[in-house]
């Protein structure tokens, strides 16, 4: 018992026990040191795990100065470090079965003092600040202190094994497929942003070499695990058929072949594994009293140092996934897993039907991995049972070769994803074919399951395999794909799908085309592949979408069938050709003939199918063109109908726009007084205004009322005005704009009275005013009928005399060059004629004058106006005044017979001025009306012939000549408008104007030679004619007049000379 007792606690570095009650409240100092020289009687020494060869770390704790909260935190920290120490101890124990590693917590002490606590209850602290120094890796401790602290002959064996690992790594580095794995994967450069989402623990050969050179690997097994992790990451991320996937598989096989020789050299011992308890029971291992700890240490001193193998640590994500899988199996929970969890929770005595509450965080990693394995086995068995009754549904993804679609990384015990490949280069695409059903053999499924299970168990030590195990529970319903293989592994060609797993199991699926045109080819292919284990592929018409179930008579169905025939024909023909080359060996000549026939048949079949496809395409194109043409025609018809409807609508709108007119009238009616209506200006101008307005429905217009009075407008009637003014209704300029229209109406109208009442109504009032201004000669002196008859008897003599005088006027007018100017201004001629006619047609004079007298006055006034125009052009104002004064003297000297003479002169003037044709066309009824203005000269001539007998023939000739002279009078009358001021002066003189009218044609001839004297002679002639008429001496006076006319002609020649000068 005198020997020093050995203590094997099996705790790794970093463990800090709870020593709050094991030490005294006084200050203490401890240190741990590893003895460099191994001696049989090991003594208690002080050493630290965090110490090195150059110094010793110390920590001074004063328990008396610690508060209760600080002590509680210290206990919690030590419990966490305890688990870390245990994990490190298991890694150290995995070096060799013959190696005995001394625990750093040897119960060695420098003194036997009772106050000294055991070294295993102490923790390692550095610095006075109370911060924990990170633990040193176990491999460094082994390299630096292993030879000095261990006197074991197997230590050199571990070093030699690591040397061989380095040699194997160099061989992998120089391998032809090893270049992609030399450096870490760069997701940015390779454009694979999801790399770290799939690969949780990346690794590469460059990192492994760096760790190996630094001595960070504590065991060759860690080295092998990192190498396997490098290749498994590449296989998991890259889909089958990818270049890097294939390279990873090849170099992984190369590594496994070299690792077998190294693995045999590693001394391994598998001590009995004691299941670890949950972390909830760790508190019981921490001594709260010194006595129980010493009893435990005494019990362990008799046993050899126990070494536990290293294990992997389950990450938080894996724990979470495991918990989700367990919750998913709540209804059908496996009994084995329930028993294991019941043992760990300490509820062994409970019945199996009770609920189990488990905290996954409280369980150890070893228990969690055991639960994970049991769960995977259960899910695998469940999947096998479901596969026996359910077929898997899959789609043909690509035409040929391997699939380039992204596949899920291979995970653990889950079956590796498989890809279906149809041999040939012209396979239909995904959108061209419905899903297909494949029923697999049970034996094949068993082989796949066993293969995947073995692969999962083989790589169970890697982190990638453990990570993939957590996702196997979610894929239990159906198989989505099958394992793809390279073309080199397809040793049995044919029409079908080849699937190989682990180079042993294969499955061949023959394509059975349902098209009628390829039945013969399918029979041939079926005969060639009778030795295959075939499963027919049938289109799933029941599960196909509705759009794919097309009626057999539709053009789309025929085009679809032709297209599929063409596609499947190429695939099956190529497969058949391959099968033909693999046929039985026979006569070469026979084979050659069969090959030629087969190729010929293939070409014919292909041409036929292509022709059918082309015909179907052409028919489809024609149908499409016809449909487009039909749609175009319908569209044109719709547009035409819309256009017609628009036209009808527009026409309706035009008709309805008349409502606005009535609305406007209603508004005007509302704004006026009671019973007042507001007509428009157009209605006021209309002659039928009253009649139209009487038919406007509710508008009751008074027929005898002026519409302007409803607007408050009244016309002022100034009858007492002395001067002639423009008519109130029509301006003088408007009348002058249409001069010839009025004269034409006078000539051609049979009812002159009615026409003049409408057209020259404005002139009646001025003429009436002139009549009033002329004094008693016109208004105050009634005409005696006897005098009128006497004057008519004297008219033939006067006409003959005047006719001779008119010859002189014709010569004077024709000799004047100024007549051209007068013609240009002929537009203004109508006004004086209208004025004279208005005066003669005035209602005031109709009551007092005979129609013949009024007619004579009109013609004489026209000639007077011509005379005024000529006189204004030849003489100045002073000469005109002298002549007018002479006329006034003669008028004043006249006696009561002046009225009679005026009547006679007016009658003569009328006969000379009025056009006989005008008189004939105007009115044939001279005797019936005094208001008719067209008293024709024919009636006057007829009366003269009755009275005068044979004198009528001679005078009629003179009248014709007078008419020719009067035809030129309008040219002279046009000058009246240029001298409106002079005319106004003549009209104002009253009596002077009447005297001028009496002068007749003679005043026109006397331009510059004493026209006043000639006027006196004319007046004397009037008196002489009256006397001759009374005495019957007519012929004598006519002869005298002829002589006087000769004198007047001479005077006219003098006038021509004056005008030329």
UniProtKB/Swiss-Prot annotation:
Disulfide bonds: none annotated. SUPFAM superfamilies: Bromodomain. Keywords: Abscisic acid signaling pathway, Bromodomain, Coiled coil, Nucleus, Repressor, Transcription, Transcription regulation. Residues 32-56, 106-152, 443-518, 538-558, 606-645, 710-1033 are annotated as: Disordered. Residues 109-118, 477-506, 733-755, 770-792, 828-852, 860-883, 912-929, 952-962, 990-1002 have a biased composition (Basic and acidic residues). Induction: Up-regulated by potassium deprivation, by salt stress, cold and treatment with exogenous abscisic acid (ABA). It holds the Pfam family BET. This is Transcription factor GTE10. The gene is GTE10. Acts as a negative regulator in plant response to changes in environmental conditions through the control of ABA-regulated gene expression. It is found in: Nucleus. Residues 448-476 have a biased composition (Low complexity). Widely expressed in all tissues. It comes from Arabidopsis thaliana.
């Amino acid at each position: 018992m005198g020997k020093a007792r050995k203590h094997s606690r099996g705790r790794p570095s970093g463990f800090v026990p709870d020593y709050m009650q094991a030490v005294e409240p006084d200050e203490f100092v401890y240190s741990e040191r590893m003895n460099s020289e191994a001696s049989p009687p090991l003594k208690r020494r002080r050493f630290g795990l965090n110490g090195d060869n150059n110094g010793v770390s110390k920590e001074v704790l004063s328990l008396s100065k610690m508060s209760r909260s600080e002590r509680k935190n210290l206990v919690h920290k030590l419990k966490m470090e305890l688990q870390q120490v245990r994990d490190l101890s298991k890694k150290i124990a995995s070096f060799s079965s013959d190696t005995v590693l001394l625990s750093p917590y040897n119960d060695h002490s420098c003194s036997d003092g009772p106050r000294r606590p055991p070294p295993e209850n102490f923790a390692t602290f550095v610095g006075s600040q109370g911060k924990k120094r990170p633990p040193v890796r176990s491999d460094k401790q082994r390299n630096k202190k292993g030879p000095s602290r261990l006197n074991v002959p197997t230590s050199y064996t571990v070093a030699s094994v690591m040397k061989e690992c380095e040699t194997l790594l160099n061989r992998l580095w120089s391998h032809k497929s090893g270049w992609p794995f030399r450096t870490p994967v760069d997701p940015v450069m390779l454009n694979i942003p999801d790399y770290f989402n799939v690969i949780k623990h990346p690794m590469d050969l460059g990192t492994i070499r760096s760790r190996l050179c630094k001595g960070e690997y504590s065991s060759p097994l860690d080295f092998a695990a990192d190498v396997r992790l490098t290749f498994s990451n590449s296989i998991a991320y890259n889909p089958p058929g990818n270049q890097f996937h294939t390279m990873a598989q090849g170099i992984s096989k190369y590594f496994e072949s070299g690792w077998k020789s190294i693995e045999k050299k590693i001394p391994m011992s598998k001590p009995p594994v004691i299941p670890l308890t949950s972390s909830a029971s760790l508190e019981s291992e921490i001594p709260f009293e010194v006595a129980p700890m010493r009893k435990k240490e005494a019990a362990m001193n008799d046993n050899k140092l126990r070494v536990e193998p290293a294990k992997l640590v389950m990450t938080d994500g894996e724990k979470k996934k495991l918990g989700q899988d367990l919750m998913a199996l709540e209804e059908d929970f496996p009994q084995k897993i329930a028993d294991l969890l019941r043992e760990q929770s300490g509820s062994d005595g409970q019945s199996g039907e009770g609920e189990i509450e488990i905290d996954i965080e409280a369980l150890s990693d070893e228990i969690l991995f055991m639960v994970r394995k049991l769960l995977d086995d259960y899910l695998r068995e469940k999947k096998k049972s479901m596969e026996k009754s359910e077929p898997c549904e899959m789609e043909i993804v690509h035409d040929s070769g391997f699939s380039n679609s992204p596949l899920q990384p291979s995970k653990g015990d889950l079956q590796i994803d498989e890809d279906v490949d149809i041999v040939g280069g012209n396979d239909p695409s995904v959108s061209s074919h419905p899903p297909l059903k494949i029923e697999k053999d049970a034996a094949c499924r068993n082989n796949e399951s066993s293969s995947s299970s073995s692969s999962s168990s083989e790589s169970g030590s890697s982190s990638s395999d453990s990570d993939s195990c957590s996702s196997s529970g979610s894929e239990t319903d159906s198989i989505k794909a099958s394992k793809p293989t390279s073309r080199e592994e397809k040793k049995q060609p044919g029409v079908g799908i080849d699937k190989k797993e682990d180079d042993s199991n294969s499955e061949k699926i023959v394509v059975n085309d349902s098209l009628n045109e390829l039945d013969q080819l399918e029979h041939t292919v079926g005969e060639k592949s009778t030795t295959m284990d075939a499963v027919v592929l049938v289109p799933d018409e029941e599960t196909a979408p509705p759009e794919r179930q097309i009626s057999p008579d539709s053009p789309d169905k025929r085009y679809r069938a032709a297209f599929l025939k063409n596609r499947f024909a190429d695939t099956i023909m190529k497969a058949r050709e391959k099968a033909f080359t693999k046929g039985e060996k026979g006569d070469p000549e026979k084979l050659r003939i069969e090959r030629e026939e087969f190729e010929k048949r293939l070409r014919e079949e292909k041409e036929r199918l292509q022709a059918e496809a082309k015909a179907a395409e052409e028919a489809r194109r024609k149908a499409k063109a016809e449909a487009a043409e039909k749609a175009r025609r319908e569209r044109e018809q719709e547009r035409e109908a819309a256009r017609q409807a628009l036209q009808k609508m527009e026409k309706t709108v035009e008709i309805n726009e008349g409502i606005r007119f009535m609305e406007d009238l209603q508004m005007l009616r509302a704004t006026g007084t009671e019973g007042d209506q507001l007509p428009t200006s157009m209605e006021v101008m209309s002659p039928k205004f009253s009649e139209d307005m009487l038919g406007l429905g509710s508008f009751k217009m008074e027929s005898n009322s002026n519409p302007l009075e409803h607007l408050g407008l009244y016309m002022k009637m100034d009858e007492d005005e002395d001067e002639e003014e423009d008519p109130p209704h029509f301006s003088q300029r408007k009348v002058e704009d249409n001069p010839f229209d009025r004269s034409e109406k006078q000539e051609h109208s049979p009812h002159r009275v009615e026409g003049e009442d409408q057209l020259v109504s404005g002139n009646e009032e001025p003429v009436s005013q002139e009549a009033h201004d002329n004094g008693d000669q016109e208004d105050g002196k009634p005409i005696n009928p006897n005098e009128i008859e006497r004057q008519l008897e004297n008219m033939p003599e006067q006409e003959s005399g005047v006719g001779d005088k008119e010859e002189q006027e014709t010569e004077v007018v024709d000799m004047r060059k100024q007549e051209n100017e007068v013609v240009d201004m002929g537009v203004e001629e109508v006004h004086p004629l209208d004025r004279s006619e208005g005066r003669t047609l005035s209602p005031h004079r109709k009551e007092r004058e005979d129609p013949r007298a009024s007619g004579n006055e009109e013609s004489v006034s026209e000639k007077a106006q011509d005379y005024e125009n000529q006189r204004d052009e030849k003489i100045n104002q002073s000469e005109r005044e002298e002549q007018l004064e002479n006329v006034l003297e003669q008028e004043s000297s006249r006696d009561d017979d002046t009225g009679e003479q005026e009547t006679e002169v007016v009658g003569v003037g009328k006969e000379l001025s009025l056009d006989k044709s005008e008189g004939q066309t105007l009115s044939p009824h001279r005797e019936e009306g005094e208001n008719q203005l067209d008293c024709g000269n024919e009636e006057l001539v007829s009366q003269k012939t009755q009275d005068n007998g044979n004198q009528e023939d001679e005078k009629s000739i003179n009248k014709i000549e007078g008419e020719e002279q009067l035809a030129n009078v309008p040219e002279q009358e046009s000058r009246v408008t240029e001298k409106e001021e002079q005319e106004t002066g003549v009209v104002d003189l009253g009596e002077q104007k009447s005297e001028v009218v009496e002068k007749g044609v003679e005043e026109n001839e006397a331009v510059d030679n004493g026209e006043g004297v000639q006027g006196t002679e004319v007046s004397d002639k009037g008196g002489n004619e009256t006397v001759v008429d009374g005495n019957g001496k007519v012929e004598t006076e006519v002869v005298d007049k002829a002589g006087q006319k000769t004198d007047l002609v001479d005077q006219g020649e003098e006038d021509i000379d004056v005008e030329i000068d």
